[in-house]
Amino acid sequence: MSLSNSSKVSVLISLLEKSRDLDYIGEAINQLEHSLQCAYFAQRSGADNEMVLAALLHDLGHYCNDTSFEDMGGYGVWQHEKVGADYLRGLGFSERVACLIEGHVAAKRYLVSSKASYLKNLSDASRKTLEYQGGPMDEGERRLFEEREDFKDCLKIRAWDEKGKQTDLKVPGPEHYRKMMEEHLSENQN
């Protein structure tokens, strides 16, 4: 028996709420606050709903499964971008949302390799996870990444990811995104 779109969204909201208890490793906020801030910045910038949802759910792979995935030395789930994207594909989210989520780690690797100042501005935790994520891209990887149709959108997700680490920022809670998620799932049904 498959879940209704409303039930799928309730599961996601429950996962988001539970992430309140998870440290956003190396930062002064929790995982929920980070996710909500990223979505807030996306929405405030005028991004479309798929971008807002990708920003909201980009770190879902750290906490969407009860099973144990390979760890990045205490810095979260290795390949969390793929774990989260695949989880959302299974729920019926669009390929664009999944690809944007997969692309946020590649965007970090790209920016580190193409902007000397970017690495200096990363938090200690983000620098540490970069090692597990493949380090800076080489020239060939950069060219391939730049050829992606969603290249610029992946960089935007990454920018919101970096910005979404503020303490005491008041933003809407997970329920604010319920209707957006339900409509997205309805639009993407075959």
UniProtKB/Swiss-Prot annotation:
Effect of H104A: Loss of dioxygenase activity
Pfam families attached to this UniProt entry: HD
EC number: 1.13.11.78
Outcome (variant: H34A): Loss of dioxygenase activity
Catalyzed reaction equations: (1R)-(2-amino-1-hydroxyethyl)phosphonate + O2 = glycine + phosphate + 2 H(+)
Record text on cofactor binding: Binds 2 iron ions per subunit. During catalysis, PhnZ uses a mixed-valent Fe(2+)/Fe(3+) cofactor.
Enzyme type, top EC level: oxidoreductase
MF-aspect GO terms: hydrolase activity; metal ion binding; oxidoreductase activity
Subunit structure: Monomer.
Protein name: 2-amino-1-hydroxyethylphosphonate dioxygenase (glycine-forming)
Organism: Uncultured bacterium HF130_AEPn_1
Encoding gene (name): phnZ
